[in-house]
Amino acid sequence: MPTQKAEATWHGSFREGEGKMRLGSGAFEGGYSYRSRMEEGPGTNPEELLGAAHAGCFSMSLARRLEAAGYPPERVHTEARVRFGREGEGYAISRIDLRTEAEVPGASEEVFLEKAEAAKRDCAISKALAGVGEINLEARLVQHAE
């Protein structure tokens, strides 16, 4: 199995400093700061990138499960909302809400929801985030326009 790489550099104090995060593939490099993480400042933050990773992993896991059941999806779109804040003397992710919708010709709502729950439980990022208090899922099957 491949090993993926990412890196981050931080310069300065917690509140006044700034940094850059970069993916090993070179597909993304972005700045982050106290303001981008704790307020609504410009830039990205670790939780936003974690949300993107979770949404991507979940979408692929759901597509794999649907295809294995005989219903290859035309499209899966997932949004992850990551709740992050103070916990004790530090910070923690307390909750992740996944919202997904998919166009899956021929799939019933029951099959779709079963596969979505399994993908939420078993995708690699969900497993890595086992310490998060809640990972919730809202899934919607979009009817394919004929």
Which stretches of residues belong to each language-model region?
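Extended beta-strand/beta-hairpin segments
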Residues: 1-52, 56-146
